[in-house]
Structures are given as C-alpha cells and as structure tokens.
Amino acid sequence: MTQATPQRIAIAGASGRMGQMLIEAVLDTEGVELAVALDRAGSPSIGQDAGAALGRPCGVTITDQLDALAQADCLIDFTRPEGTLQHLQACLRHDVKMVIGTTGFDSSGRAEIEVAAQKIAIVFAPNMSVGVNATLKLLDMAARILNSGYDVEIFEAHHRNKVDAPSGTALIMGETVASAWDVALPDVATWTRHGDTGVRKPGTIGFSVVRGGDIVGDHTVFFCGTGERIEISHRSSSRATYAQGAVRAARFLARQDNGLYDMQAVLGL
C-alpha cells in the first residue's frame, strides 16, 4: 500500500450500534476507505448498503462471508469474543491487520490473540478513547504517589445490554493501579461485597458495577485516604469517541509489522 493509496478498512458487526459508528468514522476520515462490512449469518442487514442506515450509501454491501476480508488491509472488530476469534482466524488466512475493541475474553481467548500477533499486527485495547488512555496515565501517576494509606475503589456504569462485568476499561484501570503497586490484580481485587464482609483489607482494590438504561460508559477510581479523597473520572457521552480512536489505531497499524499493541502505543504515551 503506497502513501497515496487509501487504507482499506473492514468493519465487523456492521449493522450494530458500534458498527454503524465505526462506518461513519471511516467515511469521515481521510486516508481510509470502507472496503468490507461484515455481519453475522442470518442478519437482516445482509445484502444492504453499509451506509444506508446512516443516510450515506457508500457502495459497500454488508456480507457474512469472512473471505471478503481478502479485500481489506485492516479489520476493526467490536463484537463478541466468540465472533472476534473467528474473525481473527480469517485475518490470519488473508494477512489482514486487526483492531480489537471487543471485551470479555477469557484467558484462552487472550492467549489466542497473543499468538496471532506473532504473524499479523494487532491493536488490542478494551477502550479506544483518547480520553480514557490519558486517564490511565493519570492513574499510574496517582497510584505511585498514593501507594500507602489510601484505599482504592473502582466504580463503573454501563447500559443494560452490556454482558460482561466489570468492564474491560475498569479491569485495565485496576491493572494500572496494581502494576504501579508492583502486585498482580487477581491477588488484590475484591470483586463483590455482600453481607458481613468484615473490615476492609489494606492494599485491596474494590470493584462496583451498575448496569442500566443507555449509559455509554462511566468510570471513577477513588483513592480514599484519611481526611481526603481523590477521584479520577472519565465519562463517555457518545460511542463516537471509541470509533474515532479505533480508526486512529487502524491508521497506526498501517505503519507497523506484526506485533501486539495497545492504545498507549497508538498515542505515543
């Protein structure tokens, strides 16, 4: 692909809310073009123009044929773990780079992505928002300073249809704090509380979750000390910020060889 040639982008889950946001972001970004729009087999969107629902017909027909990825340079995927892993295998077959914003992978799914990154370039991040990734840098700084005498609690809220909890963003926030403390998150996490929980154990990281309505995504990390409390928050009002970040990640991959990258690498943080 020469510099003058647009990067050919494929979108998975093309008829969904996030898929439509991604399509719009691609159509609005110079240097990229929508080449492939994928959806699940049996979807009523199959055969329709990918931009029609946006009022922006683009000449790309939604398909369920994964071999259509041969026409793309990079796939952006915000679907479900099982679907993303199927798409990953198709990307390996056709040497297509991949931006993965899907959350909820188990350890074997994450391992599969790591192995695939030895052959293709992948950006794998639970949150593509530039603001969230700036927030992670602030969290790292705060956790290194507030490493003694402060209790950490992570609160997150999302819409009623989100199926994994805590969110991938909340988990990476917890991992950021744990890493700054030189501990592993599973060793210090408190996932739920109910009944007589006893006194809070020092050095633990608590999580609390809300699911309801159409909340796009709220995250707050509390550093609770004696006589003071520091709160670092990020609130999303639109999925557009995730879509814009994902397209930015795809542009980053155009310059990369095989390897596994996160949004910190994309943003140069």
Swiss-Prot record:
Binding-site residues for NAD(+), renumbered to this chain: 13-18, 39, 101-103, 125-128
Gene3D superfamilies: Dihydrodipicolinate Reductase, domain 2, NAD(P)-binding Rossmann-like Domain
CDD domains: DHDPR_N
Residues the record lists as binding (S)-2,3,4,5-tetrahydrodipicolinate: 159, 168-169
PROSITE patterns, per database record: DAPB (PS01298)
Any single Pfam family the record assigns to this protein: DapB_N
Sorted UniProt keywords: Amino-acid biosynthesis, Cytoplasm, Diaminopimelate biosynthesis, Lysine biosynthesis, NAD, NADP, Oxidoreductase
GO cellular component labels: cytosol
EC annotation from Swiss-Prot or TrEMBL: 1.17.1.8
Enzyme class: oxidoreductase
Name this polypeptide is given: 4-hydroxy-tetrahydrodipicolinate reductase
Gene behind the chain: dapB
